[in-house]
Amino acid sequence: LPISEFYTADCQKNTLNIERKIRNLMREVTLNKGGTFTIKSVEVMPESLPAVFTRLVADNVGQYEKSLVIDLGGTTLDVGVIVGQFEDVSAVHGNPDIGVSMVTKATLTALKMASSDTSPMIADELIKNRNNLDFVGQVVNEVSKLNLVLDTIDTAINKLGELVVDDLLQYRNVNRV
């Protein structure tokens, strides 16, 4: 589950959400070729926090050090503060209004303005390859709008960065990010 759904606002496990997730997964599954199997056991974990566990151990993080874990997804920003090597989770936060899709949407709008109506997949590839002018030229139909498209991408990325930083200001007192 996303951090903000796995934990309550006071950093306790949200047993209601966890049980709901388990019930949703404990079922018979039918494969494409007709075979079936039943899921008999499920362990629900908070997204992104376990991913840093090996790093915390490798870095020999002390028991009182606080680590800020940031998970910037397509449509959400999830944050957790881990104490030590996962001895405790001292803060959780989720913001459903901040995500990478903000850049994708801005790019799609700019592409439409450049007579290049396309898909989110192509927009995402353009964002990743925006410094490859050969690729940009293949995607942007109206060459006179090429700078508009690239400027829109840069502006959207900068805006996303500002929103993330602003949203994380309350976590200034951590030891590591």
Over which residues does each language-model region extend?
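Nucleotide/phosphate-binding catalytic cleft detector across ATP-hydrolyzing
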Residues: 1-69, 87-100, 133-177
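Hydrophobic, aromatic-enriched interface-forming segments
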Residues: 49, 70-81
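Glycine-rich phosphate-binding loop plus the immediately following alpha-helix
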Residues: 80-122
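Conserved, helical-rich catalytic subdomain that frames metal- and/or nucleotide-binding sites
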Residues: 115-136
